[in-house]
Amino acid sequence: MNRKYTRLQFAAAMIGCAASFAFAPSAHAQAAPDYAALLAAPDRSDNDKQADKRRDPLPFLQFAGPRPGMKVLDMGAGGGYSTELMARAVAPNGAVYGQNPADASDKMKAAFDARLATPGMKDAAADVRPFDDPAPPGTKDLDMITFLFFYHDTTYMNVDRAAMDKAMFAALKPGGTLVIADHAALPGQGTTVGKTLHRIEESTERQEIEAAGFKFVAEGNFWRNDADTHDYPSYKKDAPIDNFVLKFQKPN
């Protein structure tokens, strides 16, 4: 994005997103791509490849399992790093919506829009919608939703989390999956440190998701870190951070 969005431009982007994918034929997902080769693609930006060293995306891709032909919603997409990874994984006949709220920061909007112009985003579109109503209108056939390191932020924002979780459930097809990652808080802290430490208790997040009808199916331990004392902000530079990753499914 080399320009600032007005609310009208955001509305246009949202409508364009829905028009792009809502009526596309549903493609059958194929075999998983070579995720290591995807990450090594020569047209990925140097910034993203540097970010890979910190974010370690390979085990996440292997755990989540995006495949060509899938339709994916990337919640709290931010500047689009994870959206692009999903878009590359579902290419050439899939679709990815990168969701951000209309009141996201100008810096975040600019980063996402600039990314949309790159080759890796040809199967992606902006989805400018609130967290508690995140999918394009009428969407009920998503194969996957990803929600990375932002659920804790909704605990102090003006977001109805119960409505958000139910909306995600409704947007998935039966058998579709929700893969969610967040920064771990101490037992008993629940949502109380969402704004101060940018963390959330794993059991609290799981309980909220399951209350919407999701079935818990797997946990990934690849981003856990026992050296984290959980008493400092998750954004503390160079500090060890304990992250949990959970996979849920909408029952058939």
Residue ranges and their predicted role:
Residues 108-136:
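S-adenosyl-L-methionine
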